[in-house]
Amino acid sequence: MPITVEDFEAARPQLLSVAHRMLGSVHDAQDAVQTAWLRAAAGHRAERIDNPAGWLTTVTARLCLDELRARRRRGEAPLLADAIPAEQLSADEAVLRTENVSRALLVLLEQLTPPQRVAYVLHDLFAMPFDQIAQVLDGTVPSAKKHASRARRRLHSPAPVEARRQARQAPDREIVEAFLAAARTGDTREMIRLLAPDSVRDADAALLPPGARTVVTGATAIATETVRFADRIRAICRLTVDGAPAHLIAPGGHPLAVLHIGTDRGQVTRITLRPVRPTDVFAAV
């Protein structure tokens, strides 16, 4: 029985979710799903397809695996947010919010090998059996399990001992989180209360609009300026960066900037913002 348009439309939301977790891009996910449908619609398959959704998922996953491997061959580093067209970035951000996708997880998935990412996404996020995953990877069940296990260890292994110590001993973490909460909602009064009167915000010029000051001093000035960047603050997740705890601004799950917030005596004293570097290594806190 051939796959019908109705079969495809019923499966499309799941296919897009699977492809997005694998590729990290709504645009690329849509391409993979559309290609899977074109292959199904070509009608060259003689055998009966009893599970259209399963067949489409397998084909989509193979296409994603091919794309991930092609990226590796081309030597492509994960795209940083400032290298992605605004329309595509908005689409990626919308998926994170509407589907409640972990921003930090999407960042960390970029550090897996293609087989590890496919095995982890299919099994741990979408509960696909390993015998089917082995078919996608063109390997054995034990090898598929090994890829998923290695992905798990990499994604969920504890941060370095020093990073965990720093995270535990980070002064006034509640103050930092309260400041970020106020920044997300544009609450200038609360930000001013949490900022020290002589606080300093130091940002790389590459992250600011042309002509904006790289250094801003004073609670009122910092709070007023921070309101302009509330959308970026809403795209924050907490990770370790090169072994040290930090906040990462990652619109749509694509890294943009590393944010460090210093405190003293219950107030925010310094905010430092720098662009993400291709050599940065991220890990769960």
Task: List each language-model region with its residue ranges.
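Active-site-adjacent scaffolding segments
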Residues: 1-31, 35-176, 187
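N-terminal regulatory/sensing modules of transcriptional regulators
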Residues: 179-182, 189-192
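Amphipathic alpha-helical interface segments
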Residues: 237-238, 242-285
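A solvent-exposed, acidic/Ser-Thr-rich amphipathic alpha-helical stretch
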Residues: 197-236
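Short amphipathic alpha-helical surface patches that mediate protein-protein
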Residues: 34-38, 149, 193-200, 246
